[in-house]
Amino acid sequence: LSISEPVIVNVLQEVSKDKGRYSQWDEKDIFEFARALRLRSKPIVIAANKADISTAKENIRRIQATGRIVIPCIAEAELLLKRAAAKGVIEYIPGDPTFKVKDHALREEQKRALERVRILMQEYNGTGVQQSIDATCFNALNLIVVYPVEDADRLSDKDGNVLPDAFMLKQGSTAKDLAMHVHSELAEHFLYAIDARSKQRLGAEYRLKDRDVIKIVSAR
């Protein structure tokens, strides 16, 4: 099930506070532990699609009342925006709360469709699609984004590409963990890392922060 020991221990400690020794647990106690472990180790984010239909708001409120992570989504609007952006009709970056029309020579039906999408986006602060991905990565899975670079001054790789890669790692990951994700040999011959912003030298056990830009220095 890919559940780490620290997670199991943490859930055990939380559940067992008022239950005494594990050997004395009954079936109800075991079920409560199993449920808590599942919720902690396999979090669920609900992308509540079709949030624009009339019954959606009440359904979303009802699910949110259970404490679950629920993101209202309008996937059809996201698809329309991406297609329009690909054709140069609008400027839109996934996750933005609105968009800008570039081509004003649109048919009336196209204008109405875009205006309808704009109104929905104002209500939900976007289409909810990118927000669902963000909530899954950063809230449910507690991931961080780290940028490895070869040139700490130019923030680039050896070919001059600025911030060429982005790695999503678990919170608590170290500089050496990043090296392993880039290449196993970097981790094997790891010497130290450099924070590209502060130019500070970092050890193997340095705990990475979200949006760190890191250069790995190895013996090879």
Region roles according to the model:
Residues 1-220:
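C-terminal-of-GTPase-core extension/linker across diverse P-loop GTPases
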